[in-house]
UniProtKB/Swiss-Prot annotation:
Protein name per UniProt: Ubiquitin carboxyl-terminal hydrolase 33
Organism per entry: Danio rerio (Zebrafish)
UniProt function note: Deubiquitinating enzyme involved in various processes such as centrosome duplication, cellular migration and beta-2 adrenergic receptor/ADRB2 recycling. Involved in regulation of centrosome duplication by mediating deubiquitination of ccp110 in S and G2/M phase, leading to stabilize ccp110 during the period which centrioles duplicate and elongate. Involved in cell migration via its interaction with intracellular domain of robo1, leading to regulate the Slit signaling.
Example GO molecular function: zinc ion binding
InterPro entries: DUSP-like_sf, Papain-like_cys_pep_sf, Pept_C19_DUSP, Peptidase_C19_UCH, Ub_carboxyl-term_hydrolase, USP_CS, USP_dom, Znf_RING/FYVE/PHD
Organism lineage string: Eukaryota, Metazoa, Chordata, Craniata, Vertebrata
């Protein structure tokens, strides 16, 4: 095709003859300089030039070629859009590529990607957005091509660099979790952080090396190991460590570095979030549980209200049957249902008085504001923070576990109930919620309920978990668990007898007799049933009821409210006493496919997929004091099992895996419907129907569509700001964040999953740019003024008064003015460093405080407010001043004499 449209680009006359077949053939080629393949290859359109080069996503050899040869026109072989380097704009050619290839022409109806006030500039310029690439069937097709067995990716070993088998086994197990690995391989634009030691970049490099096509025999994970040691000193040195503790430390740090703000829906009628600085309830259970901060990771993006369950939930099962016809109890049932459903909004810890007539109002912050006629209904809000990595072995791990709570009937599995008064002052600083690929893949929710058997008051706790630490039941415990399946009352009360429903009396008796001769046969289902079993709180473990104000007998159970995409199960094989440690060597049999979690779900759970297949398992050989870690992993490409023993990678049979002494297991949701959906979308891509609109979709969500059993609603918020534009800080690499798909594919995905918002036009948000400039100006002014005032304070020899300020608040303010934190710190809070003595507020001894001048205090207080004022006097007092004057007077008198 020669010539061309009525375009004002004078360089179109230089276009040579080119056919549709030639463009298609070039699109399957590679860059002539760096040999990288597509997509995003650019072909030179100069007459007689056949050059094909890579774009900005690689070395941008197409631009280099244009600069060296002065060939101005180039065409993107993926989108077939034409760019003129001389005119610095997109131009259009009149071409006839056939009816099935009209997708590129449809781009004519779509405005080029540009800012609202300017044309598209030269690719790569700071003020422009490079046109994102169009998606192909390869971008969404999960059908892996058949590879040569000797060249299968993902079979690279890890070198042991000094007792690091615990790390190598954990890394190989994580590496074979497709949702996480594909994120680091395909969503590189999101792997950015300014936090040290940038562990996410080291992990991304490691994953790239492990799954490279030209794989090496092994990789040395030095950079990642150095980063872990910088995060947690426990891993320094060359002593053997716990593999599960390493996993928690690694995933916590990855979450911190990759977390992004969850956009808050604008709701003018939202309830005011309550203060979340709770006092601890006086429970008889030990305070040894901390939940992870990933409550902020709730990624429900649909706009529908909470689903009303058809069946009653587990909390209702605890109530006396004779009261179910009572009108007050019916109101309370509705309240408890709402409290259960609040789990999708965050981690909550609530006490419900079963005689109150309260109605919960769920705020956008995940808190619940109760309105009722009774004053003894209290709501508990969990103060949930992601735990720091453990500093010891199993004994400490149980206290820092992100697993759900249990009572002391199973060791080291108790909950902490924290409460606040009904109405508390509102916090000025917004409590932001965050999510990351870690929280999206591994976070689930547990609902735990405790009922007082005297007043029927129910305490409901919703907490997020990242892994579940399961006890290994002994012989007597197994007998109780198996026999409970034949006691209907216990099943109704919330026990997990459903897990053993198919077992009859004869099978139970035979298995029980067999266990006396050959030892108990423990299954993973037994461990789960033991964890979720109902517990009676009595004797030394009575429940402290807030309504009765006494220790009462109670009943406690927990269920799963929402299931994670990948379920991480930790078997508690190690017991650490004061003087010695032991290891439980009991073999726990586990399924390779079809782990069913349905018996452990809450009745009103919205989980659609409850079946899991095994991905990988970490095993420990040896004793509690010494041993060796290996991992068995299923390769996603050929579905075969391999043993990863440091540098050695060996194919093994399924029976070998099932006989392993499992320590940590990774299970992934299994859903055949998702595979069918992917194939359907692939066929829609291949149809290449003409469309007038092109849609931009988040690469991160497309990765979830490819690897998750339940990808959830479409979410484009990872590349959009609250105003619907591109945040200025993401404009430079927008091509790494989005993919352009045709209208027919978007229509199908949107009708199937919902979500959004729909995006047909990309532009840099000027509103965000103005806000950033204002914020930077404020930061600079505050920082400069503080430096000047503090310098004057340092030069002052004897200040009359010195003001104290909480270092906790000061660090938050410092993070804000240095650009590390987005939001201002809120009002000054000196309550933790102040103590009231005889009506006077003074500095608390040993308080974490700093000293500033009166001028500095007034400056900060005028901007942020808060208090109280805490001052200290300098050591030179008025008394000492009077004494010095007396001495001078005596000296004068002496001289006179």
């Amino acid at each position: 095709m020669s010539g061309v449209s009525s375009n004002d680009c004078p360089h179109l006359e230089c276009v040579g003859e080119i056919t549709k077949e030639e463009l298609i053939q070039k699109s399957h080629g590679q860059c002539q300089d760096c040999k990288v393949g597509g997509p995003n290859l650019w072909a030179c359109l100069e007459n007689g030039c056949s050059y094909v080069g890579c774009g900005e996503s690689h070395a941008d050899h197409s631009t280099v070629h244009s600069q060296e040869t002065r060939h101005n026109l180039t065409v993107n072989l993926t989108t077939l859009r034409v760019w003129c380097y001389a005119c610095t704009k997109e131009v259009f050619l009149e071409r006839k590529l056939g009816p099935h290839k009209q997708l590129p022409n449809a781009a004519k109806a779509v405005s080029p990607v540009q800012t609202p006030c300017q044309d598209l500039n030269t690719p790569g310029s700071p003020t422009s957005l490079r046109v994102p690439s169009a998606g192909t069937c390869d971008d969404l097709d999960m059908e892996t091509e058949e590879e040569d067995e000797l060249r299968t990716r993902g079979l690279t070993g890890l070198k042991n660099i000094g007792n690091t088998c615990y790390m190598n086994a954990a890394l190989q197990a994580l590496s074979n979790c497709p949702p996480l690995t594909q994120f680091f391989l395909e969503c590189g634009g999101l792997v950015k952080t300014d936090k040290k030691p940038a562990l996410c970049k080291s992990y991304q490099k490691l994953i790239t090396d492990l799954w490279h096509k030209n794989r090496n025999a092994y990789v040395v994970p030095t950079n990642l190991f150095q980063g872990i040691k910088a995060v947690n000193p426990m891993f320094r040195g060359y002593s053997q460590q716990d593999s599960q503790e390493f996993l928690r430390c690694l995933m916590d740090q990855l979450h911190e570095e990759l977390k992004e703000l969850i956009p808050e829906p604008e709701d003018p009628n939202q309830a005011v979030a309550m203060d979340d600085s709770p006092d601890e309830d006086n429970h008889s259970q030990s305070d040894d549980f901390q939940s992870c901060e990933s409550c902020g990771s709730s990624d429900r993006a649909d706009n529908e209200g909470p689903r009303v369950p058809e069946d009653i939930n587990e909390a209702e099962m605890l109530m006396p049957e004779q009261n179910q016809n009572n009108r007050d109890w019916q109101k309370e049932k509705n309240l408890i249902n709402n409290l259960y459903r609040a789990g999708s909004h965050g981690d909550l810890d609530k006490d419900v008085d079963t005689t109150s007539d309260s109605r919960p109002i769920i705020s956008s912050q995940g808190a619940i504001k109760a309105q009722g006629r009774t004053s003894d209904s209290e709501i508990q809000v969990s103060s949930t923070v992601r735990p720091q990595s453990p500093t010891g072995n199993e004994g400490i791990t149980s206290r820092l576990s992100s697993s759900p709570p249990k009572s002391s009937a199973w060791p080291n599995l108790s909950s902490t109930h924290k409460k606040v008064p009904m109405f508390t002052p509102t916090k000025t600083k917004r409590q932001r919620k965050y999510h990351s690929i870690i929280s999206e893949v591994f976070d689930g929710t547990i609902v735990s309920s405790v009922q007082c058997l005297t007043c029927d008051r129910v305490s409901v706790t919703l907490e997020n978990f990242q892994d579940i630490s399961l006890p290994i039941p002994g012989k007597e415990d197994l007998a109780k668990l198996h026999s409970s399946s034949h006691q209907t009352a216990l099943v109704k009360a919330g026990s997990c007898g459903e897990a053993y429903a198919p077992q009859g009396w004869i099978a139970f008796v035979m298995e029980y007799i067999k266990s006396w001769f050959w030892g108990p046969v423990v299954t993973l289902q037994d461990c789960l049933a033991a964890f979720f079993a109902r517990d009676e709180l009595k004797g030394d473990n009575m429940y402290s009821c807030e309504k009765c104000k006494k220790l009462r007998n109670g009943v406690k159970f927990c269920k799963v409210q929402s299931l994670p995409e990948i379920l991480c199960i930790h078997l508690k094989r190690f017991r650490h006493e004061l003087m010695f440690s032991t290891k439980i060597g009991t073999h726990v049999s586990f399924p390779l496919e079809g782990l069913e979690m349905q018996p452990f779900l809450a009745k009103d759970s919205s989980a659609l997929t409850t079946t899991y297949d095994l991905l990988s398992v970490i095993c420990h050989h040896g004793t509690a004091s010494s041993g060796h870690y290996i991992a068995y992993c299923r390769n996603e490409l050929n579905q075969l099992w391999y043993e990863f023993d440091d540098q050695s990678v060996t194919e093994v049979s399924e029976s070998c895996v099932q006989n392993a002494e499992a320590y940590v297991l990774f299970y992934k949701k299994s859903n055949d419907e998702t595979q069918k959906e992917r194939r359907k979308v692939t066929s829609l891509f291949n149809m290449m129907e003409p469309s007038l609109l092109q849609f931009y979709v988040s690469r991160q969500w497309l990765n979830k569509f490819k690897t998750f059993a339940e990808p959830g609603p479409i979410s484009n918020h990872d590349f959009l700001c609250a105003h619907g534009g591109i945040p200025p800080n993401k404009a430079a690499y927008i091509d790494d964040l989005v993919l352009m798909i045709p209208q027919n594919v978007w229509d199908h995905l949107y009708s199937r999953y919902g979500g959004g918002p729909a995006v047909n036009h990309l532009y840099v948000c000027h509103t965000c740019q103005n806000e950033i400039e204002k914020l930077e100006k404020r930061r600079k002014n505050e920082l400069d003024m503080f430096v000047r005032l503090n310098k004057a304070f340092q030069e002052e020899e004897s200040p009359v008064v010195i003001y104290c300020i909480s270092m906790q608040w000061f660090r938050e303010w410092e993070s804000f003015v240095k650009g590390k934190d987005i939001d201002p710190p809120g009002p000054i809070d000196n309550s933790k460093i102040a103590v009231n003595k005889n009506g006077h507020i003074t500095l608390k001894p040993g308080a974490d405080s700093g000293q500033i001048s009166e001028e500095t205090w007034n400056f900060l207080h005028n901007i942020h407010g808060g208090g109280p004022v805490v001052t200290v006097r300098p050591s030179v007092s008025h008394q000492e001043s009077e004494t010095s004057q007396s001495e001078e007077k005596i000296e004068v008198e002496t001289r006179t004499v």
